[in-house]
A protein has these predicted regions:
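C-terminal active-site/capping subdomain that shapes the small-molecule cofactor and substrate pocket
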Residues: 158-249
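One-carbon transfer enzymes
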Residues: 1-166, 210-213, 219-221, 238-249
Length: 249
């Protein structure tokens, strides 16, 4: 049903008389009247109570977390606040983008869900309340989040770029060209140049600590490409400043 909490949608679902309701990436909140006397569970892409909300994968990566995973929880009135029935863990490798991590967690999810359902059927399922003192929130991302602050460390910049790829993406102005940064690497050292300064013609940008190597970019209106392909035939001005504006609040 398009609107599950209205009378028609609610009646259609309850008429199924299912033993268990499984919710995965569903854009509507199931109301209390719909959930009464039902075993209803949800798969959420974080290690709850860390990163409740709409964008847990992006939030974990931008924050520099080194590990995330999936949680199966009971559905509750408050978003993502149900009892934790099971979790699976996965390391966040520096090379991952949010899109790649999403796909890996999507592969892990069914196994975790089946394990929880099996424990439910077998009567061995245990539930654990979330520690409210450890709750962090993952707000929905928008195009306005697509900025970067080169005054931060190179590692923080890498985490932000990969955590916002493929969407909304991080945009910079390099010379007279607008670029989306698709894949980067953090490098140590490189002196004390002004953050945002172009350090070499191969896409090295100074940060507050270390420097960011541009590996894959997407010029406006074009497909993603290696930075070397973008730079081929262009004059990359050493010492020029790459800019990225954070929209006003």
């Amino acid at each position: 049903p398009e609107r599950v909490n209205e009378t028609e949608g609610r009646d259609r679902i309850r008429a199924l008389d299912a033993d268990a309701w499984v919710v995965i990436a569903f854009g509507q909140k199931l109301g209390r009247r719909l959930l009464e006397d039902r075993f209803a569970i949800n798969l959420h892409a974080s290690l709850l109570p860390r990163w409740r909300g709409a964008a847990p994968i992006n939030a974990a990566m931008v924050a520099g977390d080194t590990e995330t995973g999936n949680s199966v929880i009971t559905l509750a009135e408050e978003m993502d606040a149900g009892l934790v029935l099971g979790q699976s863990r996965r390391a966040i490798e520096p090379r991952y983008t949010a899109g790649e991590l999403h796909d890996l967690l999507a592969e892990d999810g069914p196994e975790l869900m089946l394990r929880v359902l099996g424990q439910h059927v077998g009567g061995t399922l245990e539930a654990e309340a979330q520690d409210e003192s450890r709750v962090t929130l993952a707000s929905k991302m928008s195009k306005a989040d697509g900025w970067i602050d080169f005054a931060q460390s190179a590692e923080a910049c890498r985490a932000r770029v990969h955590g916002l790829t493929p969407w909304p993406g991080v945009g910079i102005e390099l010379g007279d060209t607008m670029l989306k940064l698709r894949r980067v690497a953090a490098e140590a050292g490189h002196g004390s140049a002004k953050p945002g300064a172009v350090l070499d013609a191969d896409g090295l940008i100074a940060c507050g600590e270390g420097a960011l190597r541009l590996l894959e970019v997407q010029p406006a209106g074009k497909k993603p490409m290696a930075f070397s392909a973008f730079a081929n035939g262009r004059e990359i001005a050493i010492g020029s400043i790459a800019r990225s504006e954070r929209p006003p609040c």
